[in-house]
């Protein structure tokens, strides 16, 4: 069976305040990186899955929705490539 490497990217929805991103932005400003704005902090989760691609895609979509993200507050997208 084929193996797939997945990357899941999870970020707060634009309407949700990002205190961690704001802290990073302030720190950058204090370090004279004053041209940086709109910093948002998210998560990258990497997984390896085994199976046929359609089933792996369905499984990954469910894992992303049910376990790796909170759809109320976060947006999530994933990339899948053969390992």
Model-derived features: where do they sit?
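Non-catalytic terminal accessory/regulatory regions of metabolic enzymes
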Residues: 1-83
